[in-house]
Amino acid sequence: MKRMKVLMLTFLMTAALAACGSSGSGNGLSGSVSTNGSTSMEKVVLILGEQFMLDHKDVKISYDPTGSGTGIEAARTGTADIGLSSRALKEGEKEQGLVETVVALDGIAVIVNAENPVADLTLEQLAALYTGSADWSSVGGSGAVAAVGRESGSGTRDGFEFITGTEGSCKLAQELTPTGAVLEAVRSNSQAIGYAALSAVEGKEGIKTVTVSGVACTEETVLDGSYPIQRPFVFVTREGEPLSETAQTFFDWAASADAAELIRAAGAVPTAK
């Protein structure tokens, strides 16, 4: 069961946080800021929230990791100050008065079991593996494919399926909600293939990332656009509905160049210069 995460300071992030204070530190802000949505944005939201609370002792920032679709709806209904989405807003969502602000970019890494000999796949091959029209033998491996995907409404899933052209046609062996469950499913099954945020797969044992059309998923290739499977990390708010002073201050700082190093430390690619 998902639980609201109230951000707590961690010793591991102390050095990074100390070097990247939010603007307006100690200006008397107080109150709470609620964020809700993308599980892929967890590291980014946690490190930004921790720094902001370090600088503003009377502010509490909460993060509810419900998935992009739920976060967008939370922003629309006003049950969260800031919705979190790891995909761009759809036209229908914009027509409902929602506004997106891209704070970072993230590559969607394609992962296989560490024992799988396959090292590179094209978008067309990925589509074939996920729709069931090909097995591992067609791309240098052997046996059936156990395609692992995210739940309906996941921004990671929406991004992956849109880019690979597999919307509505994937044949999934497992459909999982948290990113960690996808990593574990691939780690424990030699026939599995999955996808996850770049920041989530780095350094994980038992899995490996494959290149896509010869391009590795790295910060550099995401930023320069050469890696084909990437998506935005988005703050979602309501047009014409002002945030509280505290929430607006957090929003402005998180979307600025002042927060860029923290976003980078969380494994994403900042968009602010």
Please identify what each model-predicted range represents.
Residues 1-3, 56:
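Low-complexity, intrinsically disordered short peptide segments enriched in small/polar/basic residues
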Residues 20-69, 73-273:
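Exported/periplasmic ABC-transporter solute-binding proteins
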Residues 3-23:
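Sec-dependent N-terminal signal peptides of Gram-positive bacterial secreted proteins and lipoproteins
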